[in-house]
Amino acid sequence: MEADSTTINVTETPKERKGKAPLLAAPPASSGVKRVLQKAPKGGYKRGLAVFDVVLRLAGIATALGAAIAMGSTDQTLPFFTQFFQFKAEFDDLPAFTFFVIANAITAAYLALTIPISIVCIIRPHLVAPRVLLIFLDTVMVALTTAAAGGTASIVYLAHNGNSDANWPAICQQFNDXCQKVSGAVVASFLTVVVLMLLIVLSAFAL
């Protein structure tokens, strides 16, 4: 009787098997989390560029609008006059100054109208088409604003220094206030050009 022995085989219950299942499924879950974490910084990077794009467009509106207003309000009349002449300087005396006002006003309006597109890029940072459109339009505005600022800068230079070869005297000694406003407008316009170029670079990096 004492020599007899009984062998009992214990099998795993379904509950015990279920208890081990999460341990086996844990690695795929963690790998999925890694994939999500790898994609998140990319979208955040583009979203940050889009936010900076909006800020630069607001700055460009301020500089372009300031340039147009400063040039458009240029008007100075000298305190002395003759029987036949009154010495007065206005921006519309020169076609280049008129073009300058129109070009900067167009640029300011364009930057305001493209802010909604930049907001779309903030909401959906992975979109490519809006950024390509902004690159094209910003390049056109760079050409327009540079042409206006460059043409006006040459005239302002002559107004300050004159040209002895062409017998053109400097007039800024007489029209000091007008020349200061015009010079400030040219500086603001070139700042707008810099802003537009930065916008192009930002859009290119975000593609």
Swiss-Prot record:
Q: Which Pfam families match?
A: CASP_dom
Primary localization class, coarse: membrane
Q: Which residues cross the membrane?
A: 49-69, 99-119, 132-152, 185-205
Keywords of this entry? Cell membrane, Cell wall biogenesis/degradation, Membrane, Transmembrane, Transmembrane helix
* Location of region: Disordered: 1-20
Q: Where is the composition biased (Polar residues)?
A: 1-12
Q: Which InterPro entries does UniProt cross-reference here? A: CASP/CASPL, CASP_dom, CASPL
Kindly report every residue range on the membrane side named Cytoplasmic.
1-48, 120-131, 206-207
Membrane topology per the entry is: Multi-pass membrane protein
Give an example GO cellular component term for this record: plasma membrane
Cellular compartment(s): Cell membrane
What is a biological process (GO) this protein takes part in?
Answer: cell wall organization
Membrane topology, Extracellular segments:
70-98, 153-184
Assembly? Homodimer and heterodimers.
The record's similarity note reads: Belongs to the Casparian strip membrane proteins (CASP) family.
What the protein does comes down to: Regulates membrane-cell wall junctions and localized cell wall deposition. Required for establishment of the Casparian strip membrane domain (CSD) and the subsequent formation of Casparian strips, a cell wall modification of the root endodermis that determines an apoplastic barrier between the intraorganismal apoplasm and the extraorganismal apoplasm and prevents lateral diffusion.
User: What name appears for this protein in its UniProt entry?
Assistant: Casparian strip membrane protein 1
Question: What is the source species?
Answer: Cynara cardunculus var. scolymus
